[in-house]
């Protein structure tokens, strides 16, 4: 939605033609933009990387207040829109129980949301090479079972059956 001037007319036309629509977002856009898009969407993939704003700022360069506010509004104001929250589980950043419990509490009570913990991978390292930028994660890897543990804690905390969360 960073290019809302292009995306919104496309979404509007797709909806008019009864074409299913979806977006993938981190939610770091003005609420009015997301709200306008939501009325034309069938599905939203919404990344939540961290619940703690200071940690989010440290890891991404921006706080998460706008992101979490937008997600809460989206879930509340568009209860018929299916939202799939996803978290790339990053070693040392959000691979802990504190994050999982906080996210589970945040999602609790919303029936229109699924959750998926995505295991960390190194598939994006070539982009850093292409941009001549150092890849700061080095050879870090996510231990087996960590993403599954985060998934289980979020599901249990929010009261979702594991099958319903995918």
What role is predicted for each listed range?
Residues 156-166:
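Radical SAM enzyme core and accessory elements
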Residues 14, 154-157:
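Hydrophobic alpha-helical packing residues
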Residues 78-83, 99-100, 135-148, 166:
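A broadly tuned preference for mixed-charge, low-complexity surface segments
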Residues 1-118, 123:
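Conserved AdoMet/S-adenosylmethionine-binding subsite of the radical SAM
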Residues 105, 113-114, 128-154:
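A structural motif corresponding to the C-terminal lobe/cap of the Radical SAM core domain
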């Amino acid at each position: 939605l960073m290019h809302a001037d292009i995306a919104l007319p496309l979404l509007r036309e797709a909806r008019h033609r009864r074409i299913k629509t979806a977006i993938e977002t981190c939610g770091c856009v003005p609420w009015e933009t997301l709200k306008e898009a939501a009325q034309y969407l069938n599905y939203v993939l919404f990344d939540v990387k961290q619940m703690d704003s200071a940690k989010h700022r440290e890891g991404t360069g921006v706080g998460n207040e706008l992101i979490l506010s937008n997600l809460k509004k989206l879930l509340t104001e568009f209860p018929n829109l299916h939202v799939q929250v996803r978290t790339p589980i990053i070693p040392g950043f959000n691979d802990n129980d504190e994050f999982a419990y906080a996210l589970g509490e945040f999602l609790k009570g919303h029936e229109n949301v699924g959750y998926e913990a995505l295991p960390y991978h190194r598939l994006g390292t070539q982009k850093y090479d292409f941009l001549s930028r150092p890849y700061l994660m080095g050879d870090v890897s996510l231990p087996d079972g960590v993403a599954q543990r985060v998934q289980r804690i979020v599901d249990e905390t929010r009261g979702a059956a594991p099958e319903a969360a995918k």
